[in-house]
Amino acid sequence: MGRHASLVLNAQGDPQIAYYDAGQGDLKHAAWTGSAWLVQTVDSAGNVGSYLSQAADAQGASRIAYYDAGQGDLKYAAWTGSGWHIQTVDATGNIGVHASLALDELGRPRIAYTNAGSDELRYAWWTAVGWEIQVVRSGKNTAASSSLALDENGRARISFYDPAWRHLRLASIEPFGVYLPFLMGDPN
């Protein structure tokens, strides 16, 4: 219990921890109420909840991106105030490991993640009509361990490890496409 944990603070500064319960194969969420921990099962549809990333919206409600190993999908869960709303973001193969979640200025989710089979790096974002998905870096063994941040203009910056070359890379998602300006080689 407690693998792949991700911590955020709600609007009152209380901790909320999303984690993968390996014994049950479930995604769980623990929220401090001020006097006790409230633990909920977010998703229990098979082996779900590993490689997760959590963010809190402006009201402090949890949003979680995670891998569904049973189906091989990237999923997204949002606390609605009364329950968890779950969506499948990407179901195009064994996809969704190393998820990194950020929320834009309007609270819309953005997720960087990789394909478990090929280490292809992808970026997904929510629009008014659904999820949009962009391939950031393709090819066998090209990306792992992604981390996403949004700049002051809401543009995505994704750091990731390039296992083929043993390099740390930085991708910038620009209006014209993907820009890969930074490369730091392994000194060993």
Describe the role of every protein-language-model region.
Residues 1-179:
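Extracellular, repeat-based ectodomains that mediate carbohydrate processing or recognition
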Residues 176-188:
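Enriched but not universal
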